[in-house]
Amino acid sequence: MTASPSKLAQLRELSVVVADTGDYDAIKRLQPVDCTTNPTLVKKALDLPVYADLLERELAWGRAHGGDDRTTTVDEVADRLTIGVGVKLSALVPGRVSTEVDADLAHDTQATIAKARKFVAMYAERGVPKDKILIKIAATWEGIEAARQLQLEGIDCNLTLIFNRAQALACAEANVFLISPFVGRILDYYVAQGQTPASIDEDPGVVFVRTVYNAFKQRGSSTVVMGASFRSTAQIEALAGCDRLTISPDLLEKLDAEHGELPRKLSPGNANNAQITPIDSDSFASGLAADPMATEKLVSGIDTFAKDLHALRKTIADKLAG
């Protein structure tokens, strides 16, 4: 008797599976289509033996090019390591690698555009074309406006920290390639408020992603919906059929070990090609202001990403000084 396929194998038939990690060996083992990175994952990755040569090479570059402006040197080494990790990962996955623009630029449209262009150029210098990467940007109004311009230049973007319908619709109206609504962090907020859902179908993170997915499909939007920030395999299973799902290695391993039927929960249905109403900065701001959860989680998410980047830079500074 043939063993039934794992839930991970079944999920691959319904959604594009993305690994939320920079762990080279985990990606090699789990074989996702895409992978997503951030400064924390890059910092963790640099502790792995597979990246030892990259780390030493870029630290040597930093020591050779370090002038009086130590901060600039550290920032440049952080960028070079971030791209270096992405280059190695791009050779492993058939699809895209998401690389994050500095979170401390989240409210600066022009600086975000400049950093995105720099990253694309750095990848190109290392033989990775722009159709292998996604530039990850926090979904502030300024970030979305940066993505609007970058998309016109053929630079595909992943707008992250999506917690609110106004954010999602603004991204779709800007023709952003992909958005990442954060399932787990939405749930975290309501659980902290004493509002634990009675069932997975009432999980506010799951409900939000389903709502956005259906709204996009009904409007004929080409923007990809990629569920992110999962706390359990139950949340993932509840979104089977979503365009893409970015999942940590531990949850991918659990899905690979589980069997039993995994039914489709989301389907494109019949899109009616309705237009998405343009959202201006005022309606975007009012949409966020009316949503305490989204306001809190966007601010804290940017702050966490910024702290993670600063931690990466501190690690580099310490190694350069050592």
From Swiss-Prot:
The active site is at K136. Keywords: Cytoplasm, Pentose shunt, Schiff base, Transferase. It catalyses: D-sedoheptulose 7-phosphate + D-glyceraldehyde 3-phosphate = D-erythrose 4-phosphate + beta-D-fructose 6-phosphate. It is an enzyme of class 2 (transferase). Pfam families: TAL_FSA (PF00923). GO terms for biological process: carbohydrate metabolic process; pentose-phosphate shunt. PROSITE patterns: TRANSALDOLASE_1 (PS01054), TRANSALDOLASE_2 (PS00958). One of its GO terms (cellular component) is cytosol. GO terms for molecular function: transaldolase activity. This is Transaldolase.
